[in-house]
C-alpha cells in the first residue's frame, strides 16, 4: 500500500516501523474518516473553482439564454445530463446571474474554508493524541529497562527518542497524510477537469508526473543517511546539554566553560553541516520540480495557442485549462517535495520502535514473600562487567545472619558496591546464586524482592518536589504523622522548623536547597518510612563534615535497629561497632571478623585503618 501511496518512492520495508506505530491511530479512525471527507470537500471545491473559469468567460458576459431543451431519454446518464443543463442555466443563463454567480463563488469558497479547517483540526487532534499515547508507552517501557541500560545509554539519547523522534514520526505523518490525500485528490480532480476541457493538452501534464517521481527518488536516496546522522547528532546535543546542566558546579569549579562550549560547538557544527545538506537538497529540489512544471506549462500554452488560432478551443476553455494547471502546480510541488519529510518520518519511526523493542529487565520470579527475616547468603558468586575476563567478584561466598550488621571495607574497585547492587538485582551474577531466607532471589518477583530493601547511598537522589513528597516516595500511602516521625528520627526537626511551610517546603532540584548532610538525612528518613527488613548503606556518610556525619550516624543507628544491615564504608571509624567486618580485595574476601579481632591480626584491615587515621588527621588539621 505504501508503494502505491508514494508512487513507488518507498517500499514496504521502509515503512515497517511506521506502519506499526499506526496502530496507535486506530482508536481515532472515525475522526480520520471525517477528516478524509473534509479533505475530499477541499479537493472538490478546489477543482470546481478551476472549472468555474470556462463558463464565466463563455457565458458570464453574454446575454441571458433560453431554457435548455432537456433529454426525454430514460437512464442515469440522461438524468445527470439534464441536471447539469438545469444547473448551468440557473447559474449562467438567467438575468439573475449578476448576483447568482458571485453568490455561488462565495458559497464555494466558504465550503472550501470550512472543509480545510475541519481537516486540519481533526488531523492535528489525532496527531497530538497519538504522540501522547506513544510517549506514555515509551515512558512505561523506560521504567521496565534494566539498570545496565540506564548506565550505558546517555540521557540525551533517551530524551531524543521520547521527544524529538516521537514528534518527527507522528507530526510528519499527520502532515504527510494530509498532503497525500488532499493534494492527490486535488490533482486527480484537476486532471479530470483538464481531461474534460482538453484531453490532448492533459497528456502533456500527465507526462511530467514520472519525471517528478524520479527527481524525488533521487533526493530520497541521497538524504537517507544524512537525516539519520542528523537525528543522532540531536541526541548527542541533548546529552551535552543535560551533562552540563547537571554538572554545572564541576564546570564552574574547574573553569570548564570553554571545554563545555567546545563540546557543544562541535556537536552544533555537525548539526548545522547536516542541516545545510538537507536544506541544499530541499532548496535544489524545488527549482528542478518548478523547471519541469514550467516546461510542461510552456508546451501547453504553445499547443493551446495553436489550437485557439485554428478554432479547436474557446478562450474560456483555454483560460480554464491554464487556471486549472496553475492550481495544480502547488499540490504537485507539495507531492514532489514530500520524499524528504517522509524519509525523516520513517527513520524517526525506526528509532521509536527500536526503543519500544528494547528488552525489559528480566523478571522470571514467581514467589512473592511479604516480609523476609533477613538471612542472606552468597554462594560461589562471580560478576563480570567486561568481556576481558576481569571479575568484579570472584567466587564470592558470604553468610549474613538475621539482624546482623556487616560492614564491607577495602580499596576502591574491590567489589564492595557490587555486593550491594547484587541484592536488589541491579547487577546480575555471572555465576553462583544469592539467597534470602533460603530462597534464590532469582525466584522472587522483582517488586517483592526490592520491597525488602531500603537503600541509602553516597549518591543521594531527591526529586524536585516538597520535603513531604520526597520522604513519602518510599510509601505513597503514608500520612503526615508517619512522615514527620521519620524526619524526626533522621534528626531533621530543625529543617522542618526552619520554614513556615514545614513538611511541605520545596527542596529544589535534587535537593539543591539543602545541605549535604540534610540531603543524606532526607534519604535516611525515606528509608525509615519504608521500614524494610534489610538495609543497604553504600558509603552513606562520605564527604560530610564532622557535625553532619555525627547527625547522620545517629540517624543510621536508629534506622538499623532490628534490621539486617550491609554497610559499605570508606571512613573505617564509622563501622567499628559492626557485628562483622568483611575485608575485600580484587573481588574476594581476604579477612573478616570484629574490629578488635582484625586489629589484633595486624593485617590488611590494620593497614587500611592506619591509612584512614592519617586521612582523618589531615582533614582535622
UniProtKB/Swiss-Prot annotation:
Topology within the bilayer: Multi-pass membrane protein
InterPro entries per record: AAA+_ATPase, ABC1_TM_dom, ABC1_TM_sf, ABC_transporter-like_ATP-bd, ABC_transporter-like_CS, ABC_transpr_lipidA, P-loop_NTPase, Type_1_exporter
Domain ABC transmembrane type-1 stretches: 33-344
Stored PANTHER family: ATP-BINDING CASSETTE SUB-FAMILY B MEMBER 10, MITOCHONDRIAL (PTHR43394:SF1), ATP-DEPENDENT PERMEASE MDL1, MITOCHONDRIAL (PTHR43394)
Transmembrane regions listed in the UniProt entry: 32-52, 91-111, 192-212, 286-306, 312-332
Domain of life: Bacteria
Family annotation (NCBIfam families): MsbA_lipidA
Residues of the ABC transporter domain: 378-611
Subunit and interaction comment: Homodimer.
Domain commentary: In MsbA the ATP-binding domain (NBD) and the transmembrane domain (TMD) are fused.
Predominant location category: membrane
Organism: Neisseria meningitidis serogroup B (strain ATCC BAA-335 / MC58)
EC number of this enzyme: 7.5.2.6
Keyword Membrane: yes
Gene name linked to the record: msbA
Subcellular location: Cell inner membrane
Official protein name in the record: ATP-dependent lipid A-core flippase
Amino acid at each position: 500500500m505504501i508503494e502505491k501511496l508514494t508512487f513507488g518512492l518507498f517500499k514496504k520495508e521502509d515503512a515497517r516501523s511506521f506502519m506499526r506505530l499506526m496502530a496507535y491511530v486506530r482508536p481515532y479512525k472515525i475522526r480520520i474518516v471525517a477528516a478524509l471527507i473534509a479533505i475530499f470537500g477541499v479537493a472538490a471545491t478546489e477543482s470546481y473553482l478551476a472549472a468555474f473559469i470556462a463558463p464565466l468567460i463563455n457565458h458570464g458576459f453574454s446575454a441571458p439564454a433560453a431554457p435548455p431543451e432537456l433529454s426525454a431519454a430514460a437512464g442515469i446518464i440522461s438524468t445527470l445530463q439534464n441536471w447539469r443543463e438545469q444547473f448551468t442555466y440557473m447559474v449562467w443563463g438567467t438575468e439573475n446571474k449578476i448576483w447568482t454567480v458571485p453568490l455561488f463563488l462565495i458559497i464555494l469558497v466558504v465550503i472550501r474554508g470550512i472543509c480545510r479547517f475541519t481537516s486540519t483540526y481533526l488531523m492535528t487532534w489525532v496527531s497530538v493524541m497519538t504522540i501522547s499515547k506513544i510517549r506514555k508507552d515509551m515512558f512505561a517501557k523506560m521504567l521496565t529497562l534494566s539498570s545496565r541500560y540506564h548506565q550505558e545509554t546517555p540521557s540525551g539519547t533517551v530524551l531524543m527518542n521520547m521527544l524529538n523522534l516521537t514528534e518527527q514520526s507522528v507530526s510528519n505523518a499527520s502532515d504527510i497524510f494530509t498532503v497525500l490525500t488532499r493534494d492527490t485528490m486535488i490533482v486527480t480532480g484537476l486532471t479530470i477537469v483538464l481531461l474534460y476541457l482538453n484531453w490532448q493538452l492533459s497528456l502533456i501534464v500527465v507526462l511530467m508526473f514520472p519525471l517528478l517521481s524520479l527527481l524525488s527518488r533521487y533526493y530520497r536516496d541521497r538524504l537517507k543517511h544524512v537525516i539519520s546522522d542528523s537525528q543522532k547528532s540531536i541526541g548527542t546535543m541533548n546529552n551535552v546539554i543535560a551533562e552540563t546542566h547537571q554538572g554545572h558546579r564541576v564546570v564552574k569549579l574547574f573553569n570548564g566553560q570553554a571545554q563545555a562550549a567546545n563540546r557543544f560547538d562541535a556537536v552544533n557544527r555537525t548539526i548545522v553541516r547536516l542541516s545545510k545538506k538537507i536544506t541544499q537538497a530541499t532548496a535544489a529540489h524545488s527549482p528542478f520540480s518548478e523547471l519541469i512544471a514550467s516546461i510542461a506549462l510552456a508546451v501547453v500554452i504553445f499547443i493551446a495557442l495553436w489550437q485557439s488560432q485554428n478554432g479547436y478551443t474557446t478562450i474560456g476553455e483555454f483560460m480554464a485549462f491554464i487556471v486549472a494547471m496553475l492550481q495544480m502546480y502547488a499540490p504537485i510541488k507539495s507531492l514532489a517535495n514530500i520524499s524528504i519529510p517522509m524519509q525523516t518520518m520513517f527513520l524517526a519511526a525506526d528509532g521509536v520502535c527500536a526503543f519500544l523493542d528494547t528488552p525489559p529487565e528480566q523478571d522470571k520470579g514467581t514467589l512473592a514473600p511479604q516480609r523476609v527475616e533477613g538471612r542472606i547468603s552468597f554462594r560461589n558468586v562471580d560478576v563480570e562487567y567486561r568481556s576481558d575476563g576481569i571479575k568484579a567478584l570472584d567466587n564470592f561466598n558470604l553468610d549474613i545472619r538475621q539482624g546482623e550488621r556487616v560492614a564491607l571495607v577495602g580499596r576502591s574497585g574491590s567489589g564492595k558496591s557490587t555486593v550491594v547492587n547484587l541484592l536488589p538485582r541491579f547487577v546480575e551474577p555471572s555465576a553462583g546464586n544469592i539467597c534470602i531466607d533460603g530462597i534464590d532471589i532469582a525466584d522472587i518477583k522483582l517488586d517483592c524482592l526490592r520491597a525488602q530493601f531500603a537503600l541509602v547511598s553516597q549518591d543521594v537522589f531527591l526529586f524536585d518536589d516538597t520535603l513531604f513528597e520526597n520522604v513519602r516516595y518510599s510509601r505513597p500511602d503514608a500520612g503526615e504523622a508517619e512522615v514527620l516521625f521519620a524526619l524526626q528520627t533522621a534528626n531533621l526537626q530543625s529543617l522542618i522548623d526552619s520554614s513556615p511551610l514545614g513538611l511541605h517546603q520545596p527542596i529544589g532540584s535534587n535537593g539543591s536547597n539543602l545541605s549535604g548532610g540534610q540531603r543524606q538525612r532526607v534519604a535516611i528518613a525515606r528509608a525509615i518510612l519504608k521500614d524494610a527488613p534489610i538495609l543497604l548503606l553504600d558509603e552513606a556518610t562520605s564527604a560530610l563534615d564532622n557535625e553532619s556525619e555525627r547527625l547522620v550516624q545517629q540517624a543510621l543507628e536508629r534506622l538499623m535497629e532490628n534490621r539486617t544491615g550491609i554497610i559499605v564504608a570508606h571512613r573505617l571509624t564509622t563501622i567499628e561497632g559492626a557485628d562483622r567486618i568483611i575485608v575485600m580485595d580484587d573481588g574476594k574476601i581476604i579477612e573478616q571478623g570484629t574490629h578488635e579481632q582484625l586489629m589484633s591480626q595486624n593485617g590488611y584491615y590494620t593497614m587500611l585503618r592506619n591509612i584512614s587515621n592519617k586521612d582523618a588527621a589531615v582533614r582535622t588539621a
